[in-house]
Amino acid sequence: MDKSKIRNFSIIAHIDHGKSTLADRILELTNTVEKREMQDQLLDSMDIERERGITIKLNSVQLKYHSKDDKDYIFNLIDTPGHVDFTYEVSRSLAACEGAILVVDASQGVEAQTLANVYLAIDSNLEIIPVINKIDLPSADVDKVKQEIEEIIGLDCSNAPLISAKTGLNVQDVLQAIVDKIPPPSDAIDNAPLKALIFDSYYDKYLGVVMSIRLKQGMLKVGDKIKLMSTNAEYEVTSLGIKTPKIVKKDFLEAGEVGWVAASIKTIKDVNVGDTITSVLNPAKEPLDGYKKLKPMVYCGIYPIDTNKYQDFKEALEKIELSDSSLVYEPETSQALGFGFRCGFLGLLHMEVIQERLEREYNLELIATAPSVVYKVHLTNKQVIELDNPALLPEAQKISKIEEPFVEIKIATPSEYIGDLMNLCQNKLGIYKNMEVIDNNRRILIYQMPLAEIIFDFFNKLKSISKGYASFEYELIGYKESKLVRMDIKLNGEMVDAFSMIVNQKFAYQRGSALTLKLKELIPRQNFEVPVQATIGNKVISRETIKAYRKDVTWKLHAADKSRRKKLLEKQKEGKKKMKEIGTVEVPQEAFVAILKIDD
C-alpha cells in the first residue's frame, strides 16, 4: 500500500458545534454510505448519543476519496467523544492520527471544551485544520470567529473552509484540505517490530473483544501471536480488518493503517485503552507513550426500587460492562435501600449515561445515592486509605488528615455573567487563578476547586446563572488537604446510612439544616413524634421534628369528667412512648432524591 495516500484524522468540537453532522456529510460525499442507509449522527450508535447530541463511544471508519488531482486517497476518520469525562479516550484517539479538523460554530465561537480538545491535539503534534460551521445561520459572525481562533488558539484562518455541515455547503473544501494539509503517516515502517496503539475496544458476541488499533510500525496477520505490553498477556489473532463503517475482514494490516483486531479475548477488562500491541516472536523494546490506567473519579450507590429486581440489575451491569471497561462496581447493602451496587464512573456525564442506559435498555427503576469522590484518608497509625463511601469513614480521633481531589476549571462565558459566576466559584471553595480575554464580550475564568463541589450541582447552577451561555471543562491537578467531616442523618435516633456524606466543615451546618428541613417536609407524619437530626460524631448540628398524628381519645367524654380524661391521655402517652421505641420510620423515595438537590 502507498503510505503517502493515507490520511488519519479526527474531528474535534465543542458539544453542538456540528461534529457528528460534518462526519455524516463526509461519509455521504465519499460514497462510503449509500443514501438509503444514511441516518443522522451515523457514527453515534447509542440512542442516548443521538438524543443528547453527544458522542460517548469512539468510532472509526475508512473512506475512499478521489481528489482534484485525480488521485485516490484513503481517509481514516477516528471519531472522538467531546465531553470532559472522556478526555483520556480523546487523547488516545488523537494519538492515532496525524491531523485534526477543528469545527467551530459561526454563531457561538470558541468554547471551553473546544480549547480543551485543541490543547490535546497540540500536545499530540497534530496538524489542525480550522473549519467554521453553520455559516448559513442568521446569527453567524464568521469574521469574529476567525479572529477568535487566530487570537486564542493561534491558528491561521485565512484559508479556513466556511461550511454548513447541515446542507453540505463547501464540505468538499474540507476533504481537499485533508489531502493538502494533513501529512501521511511518517513513521510507518513495515519491517520494524510490531507496535499498534489500542485506541478503543468493544465486545462482540461472536468475536469476543474487538480492539480498534492504529498500526504505528510492523505488520499484523491472522494467526500472529501478539502480546499486550501493559499486562504481558499473550493471544493469537483470529481475525482483523477495517470498518467502512461495516466490519470488513482482511488477511493483514500494514503500518500506517487503522483497523480492528480480534484475538478470542473473553472480557473487556483484559484490554486497556492506550496499551500497545506487539509481536511475541519479535517484540518491541518500548511501548508507545501516553498509556495510563483509567481510574473512576466519581462513585455512588445505585439500588433497584423493586428489591426483587436485584438479579436483573446485576445482569444489566454485567452486560453494560462488556462495552464499557471504565465502569467499575461491587455489591453493597444499605439498611435503608437494601441490596445494590457501589459504582465508579469517569465523571458526572458518564454516571448519568450509565444510569439512563440501565433504566432504558433494561427496564429498571433505580435510585442513586449522592455522588462522592475518592478521598485519601491519613490515619494516626500512618496508614493511608482510599475511600469513596462516606459511611465507611473511620472515627475522627483515628484520622490525622483527609485529602480530596482538586481540579482546575476553565469557564468560557459572556462578560455580563462574570460577577455571578465568580460568586458561584467562591461559594464552591474555588481559588481564583486567572482571567483570559476571548474578545470584547467573552472571557475565560480559571479557578482551582475541589472536585466534590463540581459533581454536586455546579453544572446546573452555571447554566442557570449564564442562561445557558457559559461552558466549562476541568482537569484533575492532584490531591490537597481539606477540613472535611462526615455528616450523618438520624431518624428517630437511628442512622440512615444512605444519607451520610463527607462535607467541608464550612458547609456542614448549612447542608445539615437544609437536609433536615427537606426531610421534615418529605417524610410522612407517624403516630409518634420523629426527631430528624444531622450529626457530626456525637454532636447534633441541626434538628427538626416531624409532629405525630394525634387521635382524639376524649371525644366521647363529658366535659366535666376531668379525671377520666386525664387517665385516657396518660394511657395514650404511654402507648406513643412504647410505639416510638419499637417503631420504624418509612422513608419515601423522594427523600433520597432530595439529598441530591439540597444546595438548590
UniProtKB/Swiss-Prot annotation:
Q: Which UniProt keywords apply?
A: Cell membrane, GTP-binding, Hydrolase, Membrane, Nucleotide-binding, Protein biosynthesis
Question: Could you read off the lineage of the organism from its UniProt record?
Answer: Bacteria, Bacillati, Mycoplasmatota, Mollicutes, Mycoplasmataceae
* InterPro entries (UniProt xref): EF-4, EFG_III/V, EFG_V-like, EFTu-like_2, G_TR_CS, LepA_C_sf, LepA_CTD, LepA_IV
Task: Give an example GO molecular function.
Answer: GTP binding
- E.C. number: 3.6.5.n1
In its UniProt entry, the species of origin is given as Mycoplasma capricolum subsp. capricolum (strain California kid / ATCC 27343 / NCTC 10154)
| Record localization | Cell membrane
Spell out the protein name for this chain.
Elongation factor 4
* Domain called tr-type G: residue spans: 4-186
Family listed: Belongs to the TRAFAC class translation factor GTPase superfamily. Classic translation factor GTPase family. LepA subfamily.
In which residues is GTP bound?
A: D16, H17, G18, K19, S20, T21, N133, K134, I135, D136
User: Mind telling me which GO cellular component terms the entry cites?
Assistant: plasma membrane
Q: HAMAP family from the xrefs?
A: LepA
> Which domain of life does the UniProt lineage start with?
Bacteria
Q: Does the keyword GTP-binding apply?
A: yes
Q: Does the keyword Transit peptide apply?
A: no
State the membrane topology: Peripheral membrane protein
Q: What does this protein do?
A: Required for accurate and efficient protein synthesis under certain stress conditions. May act as a fidelity factor of the translation reaction, by catalyzing a one-codon backward translocation of tRNAs on improperly translocated ribosomes. Back-translocation proceeds from a post-translocation (POST) complex to a pre-translocation (PRE) complex, thus giving elongation factor G a second chance to translocate the tRNAs correctly. Binds to ribosomes in a GTP-dependent manner.
Q: Which reaction does it catalyse?
A: GTP + H2O = GDP + phosphate + H(+)
Q: Name one GO biological process term.
A: positive regulation of translation
